[in-house]
Regions:
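Residue-level marker for buried hydrophobic side chains located in beta-strands
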Residues: 27-29, 58, 80, 153-155, ...
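Short Gly/Pro-enriched turn/cap motifs at secondary-structure boundaries
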Residues: 8-10, 115, 135-138
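Metallo-beta-lactamase
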Residues: 34-35, 131-214
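Conserved beta-strand hairpin/beta-sheet module of binuclear metal-dependent hydrolase folds
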Residues: 1-47, 145-159
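A conserved mid-domain beta-alpha-beta active-site/ligand-binding segment of alpha/beta enzyme cores
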Residues: 127
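Active-site HxH/HxHxD metal-binding segment of metal-dependent hydrolases
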Residues: 35-38, 45-124
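Accessory terminal helices/loops
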Residues: 178-187, 194-268
Length: 268
């Protein structure tokens, strides 16, 4: 009898990262910011799983908060997997760590990376006993990918959460989500937002509710509440909160609708 897929959420940084156990191996979906390796090892220790037991590391997109410790983990044995649509972006975040003089960052070793074509992703995942595929889902970034498991789990990285879809009509974000929703996912695992069980939760909210959410975020900003606390209080996606904050602080006398309009333009 085939072993059931197990999904472990590793809580050690501001990025949600996931360890997925197949019947013949394990794959890590995303990592954290450079400097979080010890915290990552501690999270693995709580699962009683050695880092060396991870077979592959898959990065949803090569922004610094998702690939920051990928090479550090790979140096312990796991292999970094880069999809063909991502090959030109592997070092996109190197300059970010250089500017902040982050000595903890180790650049990805190109000679040790395994490149996989999107069309071969099902065969690749099959090598570790996972039935599923890796899908190109641009929107948040051009190199964004999502991982779909036939058992209903969907890992999307920083693809804008479903509750924001009203803001992104006619955009690449909507196109990517439409493709994913055709698969009828059961659970969506986000890079920053709370995971969503689509069998029990409404995947999107009305525009009027978005207005209320933005107004609430604006009030917290006025009170000097940190972005982390705003996220905890509202449950909103980190990127969405950052977008609202940026629009609010850089546009004088802007109202809620003005912020939503600008976020929609940004998503095109």
């Amino acid at each position: 009898m085939k072993k059931e897929i197990a999904v472990h959420e590793l809580r050690y940084s501001n990025t949600n990262t996931y360890l997925i156990e197949g019947s013949r191996g394990m794959i890590l979906f995303d990592t954290g910011w450079a400097g979080t390796f010890r915290a990552f090892c501690s999270a693995m220790g709580k699962l009683d799983i050695p880092v060396q037991k991870i077979d592959f590391i898959l990065i949803s997109h090569f922004h610094p908060d998702h690939m920051g410790i990928a090479q550090e983990i790979a140096d312990k044995g796991p292999e970094i997997v880069v999809m063909d649509v991502q090959k030109d972006y592997v070092h996109a975040a190197d300059s970010v760590f250089a500017k902040e003089n982050n000595d903890a960052f180790i650049s990805i070793d190109d000679d040790k990376v395994r490149y996989v074509r999107i069309e071969d992703s099902r065969d690749f995942l099959g090598t570790i006993g996972i039935d599923g595929e890796i899908i190109s889902t641009p929107g948040h970034s051009d190199d964004s990918i999502s991982m779909w498991l036939d058992s209903g789990e969907l890992f999307v990285g920083d693809l804008n959460p479903l509750y924001e879809l009203e803001l992104h009509k006619g955009t690449q974000i909507e196109k990517s989500w439409n493709r994913l929703l055709e698969l009828k996912p059961r659970i969506v695992y986000y890079g920053h937002a709370k995971n969503v069980d689509l069998n029990s939760e409404v995947p999107s909210i009305k525009v009027t509710d978005l207005h209320k959410l933005v107004a609430r975020i604006m009030k917290y900003i006025d009170k000097g509440v940190s972005l982390d606390r705003i996220q905890r209080k509202t449950g909103a996606d980190e990127t969405f909160i950052e977008d609202v904050t940026r629009m609010y602080l850089t546009h004088s006398n802007i109202d809620v609708q003005g912020i939503l309009d600008r976020i929609e333009i940004k998503g095109r």
